[in-house]
From Swiss-Prot:
Family: Belongs to the GrpE family.
Source organism of this protein record: Lawsonia intracellularis (strain PHE/MN1-00)
UniProt cross-references to Pfam families, sorted A to Z: GrpE
Composition skew (Basic and acidic residues), residue ranges: 1-14
Name of this chain's protein: Protein GrpE
Gene Ontology terms for molecular function: adenyl-nucleotide exchange factor activity; protein homodimerization activity; protein-folding chaperone binding; unfolded protein binding
Entry-linked Gene3D superfamilies: 3.90.20.20, Head domain of nucleotide exchange factor GrpE
High-level lineage: Bacteria, Pseudomonadati, Thermodesulfobacteriota, Desulfovibrionia, Desulfovibrionales
Family matches, as PROSITE patterns: GRPE
Stretches for region Disordered: 1-23
Length: 189
């Protein structure tokens, strides 16, 4: 038998095994000291899990809301580009109403305008700006003040250009003149 390992006394082997075991125990104790306070309880783990699930659910809802809003307002730019066409129809009706020769054409333009407005309404567009309605700076753009006895102060006295709104989003404010009473103007001067 040729064994190249040197022979060691038995007591040396057990001393070395004891040293290895005690070294492992020291390392485990060190690990426990480092990791021990960082352990979480089952209740804490459940709470963390529930919070993560709630955050994920809120994130999904935000994504869905953003997606729905993008779809809802996808026609925003198209509608804004179409508003001058509607303005032209309004002007044709306004100026054609004074000429009897344009009566038949005026009827066709009026029908086209109504059809156009009905279609816009189906897509969530509302028309803004009526004479005698209260002035609202969020929906109206005041371009002048007029002294008017027949319209209450702070109300729309003249409509220069209609405004339009897509659901809650303003496409264009109505351009209006706002009434002011003659009596109030003189007392303020």
């Amino acid at each position: 038998m040729t064994d190249h390992t040197p022979l060691q006394p038995k007591h040396e082997i057990t001393d070395q095994a004891d040293q290895d075991t005690s070294a492992e125990m020291l390392v485990e104790e060190e690990d426990k000291k480092e990791i021990g306070p960082n352990y979480i309880t089952e209740e804490e783990a459940q709470e963390i899990r529930l919070r993560a699930l709630a955050e994920m659910e809120n994130f999904k809802k935000r994504l869905q809301k953003d997606h729905d809003e993008q779809i809802r307002y996808a026609i925003d730019n198209l509608l804004t580009d179409m508003l001058p066409v509607l303005d032209s129809l309004d002007l044709a009706i306004q100026y054609g109403s004074n000429d009897d020769a344009c009566k038949d054409i005026l009827m066709g333009v009026s029908m086209t305008r109504k059809l156009f407005l009905d279609t816009l309404k189906q897509y969530g567009v509302t028309v803004l700006g009526e004479i005698n309605e209260p002035f609202n700076p969020e929906l109206h753009e005041a371009i002048a003040h007029e002294e008017r006895e027949d319209i209450p102060e702070g109300h729309v006295s003249t409509l220069h250009q209609r405004g339009y709104q897509l659901y809650e989003r303003l496409l264009r404010p109505a351009k209006v003149s706002v009434s002011s009473n003659k009596n109030n103007s003189n007392t303020n001067k």
